[in-house]
């Protein structure tokens, strides 16, 4: 292996980390069915105060991009940074790479007096102070979106799963609609907004849905239908290309993947990998059983819209609407895992899928943030301190387990 790769990536790490990033630097895993990748967005914050960084230097992003081998990049606002893993088949490699990327961008940010927070809303950031990234693409977006774009001080997690057949990919997207609220509940990490407790576990999507072309996917049955929709919008000058379709799930513009975009960014890496693994196993289940898409129609989508709201509001504590009456999140998850267990086993990620039960039982990042807030007597600084510690290490949870909100 060319030693310049190691020098370029600034590696003086363990053998396992060295092996992982060498693989990444030389092309990653071979792309196969159900291979996957994870994208995460972080807030850049002052390393001492943990206040969000409104303006950030170009050099920081150049250094982060160089340091990670091209896997860190700007986002729409200067306060944000995105990382993307390589394509993976082995879930353990994906976990280690995600840990590496977090440590690496935090290290680079530290050279500028900054660090990163993995949460979907910054507890004290004021969206009115946000500044767009000085790139033509983002300037055009801000010209179109105006205040809605400025309010987009939000970070999410996206998971790509490779599904080669285009029409079957759309069958999976349709069949996946009722499950999207489960991913929202498991990932919720945005209970605060503009220094206020919102009352929602996942406020991010409430703000994000102000943008056009968001929310749950439409009930398209084929790539041809989707292409007609995209063509109408692009020919009418509404958007330059299909990357401006910002649904909670969408087919990728550049890759043969189906991209889950609904989740909040997880504060804990293990939670992120668990949710990505559940999505991957479910995608395999639905891809191999395309007839399941036929069961998702207007009624099922309308119920999913309601459940999306309930997942945002109550997180892991919510009751989900079904035609047979209310069902707990834990029961919905148990049923889902029963359906996908053999697929998770085949993909080598059953243990990660099982971790979703722990999240549903004890809570997501939002619950731990709220616990830190209450145990500190309502100090938002305690919340950001916990997030900062948990983003790049296995931080201890607040002193007691999150209190369980009465289910509604």
UniProtKB/Swiss-Prot annotation:
Q: What is its EC number?
A: 6.3.2.2
Xref: InterPro entries? GCL_type2/YbdK_subfam (IPR050141), GCS2 (IPR006336), Gln_synth/guanido_kin_cat_dom (IPR014746), YbdK (IPR011793)
One Gene Ontology term of the molecular function aspect: glutamate-cysteine ligase activity
Per the record, the domain of life is Bacteria
Swiss-Prot/TrEMBL keywords: ATP-binding, Ligase, Nucleotide-binding
Which reaction(s) are listed as its catalytic activity?
A: L-cysteine + L-glutamate + ATP = gamma-L-glutamyl-L-cysteine + ADP + phosphate + H(+)
User: Which GO BP terms apply?
Assistant: modified amino acid biosynthetic process
Q: Which SUPFAM superfamilies does its entry note?
A: Glutamine synthetase/guanido kinase
Q: What does this protein do?
A: ATP-dependent carboxylate-amine ligase which exhibits weak glutamate--cysteine ligase activity.
Q: Which family does it belong to?
A: Belongs to the glutamate--cysteine ligase type 2 family. YbdK subfamily.
Which PANTHER family does UniProt cross-reference here? GLUTAMATE--CYSTEINE LIGASE 2-RELATED (PTHR36510:SF1)
Which protein, by its recorded name, is this? Answer: Putative glutamate--cysteine ligase 2
- Which organism does this record belong to? Bradyrhizobium sp. (strain ORS 278)
């Amino acid at each position: 292996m060319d030693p310049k790769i190691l020098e370029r990536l600034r590696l003086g790490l363990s053998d396992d980390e060295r092996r992982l990033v060498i693989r990444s630097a030389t092309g990653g895993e071979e792309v196969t069915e159900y291979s996957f990748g994870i994208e995460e967005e972080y807030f850049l914050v002052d390393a001492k105060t943990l206040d969000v960084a409104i303006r950030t230097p170009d050099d920081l992003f150049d250094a982060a991009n160089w340091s990670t081998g091209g896997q860190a990049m700007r986002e729409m606002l200067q306060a944000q940074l995105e990382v993307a893993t390589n394509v993976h088949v082995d879930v353990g490699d994906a976990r280690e790479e995600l840990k590496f990327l977090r440590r690496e961008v935090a290290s680079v940010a530290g050279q500028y007096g900054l660090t990163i927070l993995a949460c979907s809303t910054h507890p004290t950031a004021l969206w009115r102070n946000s500044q767009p990234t000085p790139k033509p693409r983002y300037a055009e977006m801000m010209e179109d979106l105006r205040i809605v774009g400025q309010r987009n001080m939000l970070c999410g997690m996206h998971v790509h799963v490779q599904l080669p057949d285009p029409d079957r990919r759309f069958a999976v997207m349709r069949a996946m609609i009722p499950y999207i609220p489960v991913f929202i509940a498991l990932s919720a990490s945005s209970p605060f907004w503009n220094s206020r407790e919102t009352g929602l576990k996942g406020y991010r999507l409430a703000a994000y849905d102000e943008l056009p072309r968001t929310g749950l996917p439409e009930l398209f049955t084929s790539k041809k239908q989707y292409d007609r929709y995209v063509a109408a919008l692009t020919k009418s000058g509404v958007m330059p290309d299909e990357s401006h379709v910002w649904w909670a799930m969408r087919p990728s513009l550049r890759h043969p993947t189906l991209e889950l975009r609904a989740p909040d960014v997880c504060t804990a890496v293990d939670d992120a990998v668990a949710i990505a693994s559940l999505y991957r196993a479910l995608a395999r289940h639905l891809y191999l059983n395309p007839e399941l898409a036929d069961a998702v129609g207007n009624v099922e989508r309308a119920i999913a819209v309601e459940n999306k709201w309930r997942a945002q509001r109550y997180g892991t504590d919510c009751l989900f609407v079904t035609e047979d009456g209310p069902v707990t999140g834990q029961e919905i998850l148990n049923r889902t895992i029963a359906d996908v267990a053999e697929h998770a086993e085949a993909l080598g990620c059953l243990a990660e899928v099982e971790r979703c039960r722990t999240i549903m039982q004890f809570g997501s990042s939002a619950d731990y943030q709220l616990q830190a807030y209450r145990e500190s007597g309502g100090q938002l600084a305690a919340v950001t301190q916990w997030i900062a510690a948990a983003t790049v290490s296995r931080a201890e949870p607040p002193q007691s387990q999150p209190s369980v909100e009465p289910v509604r």
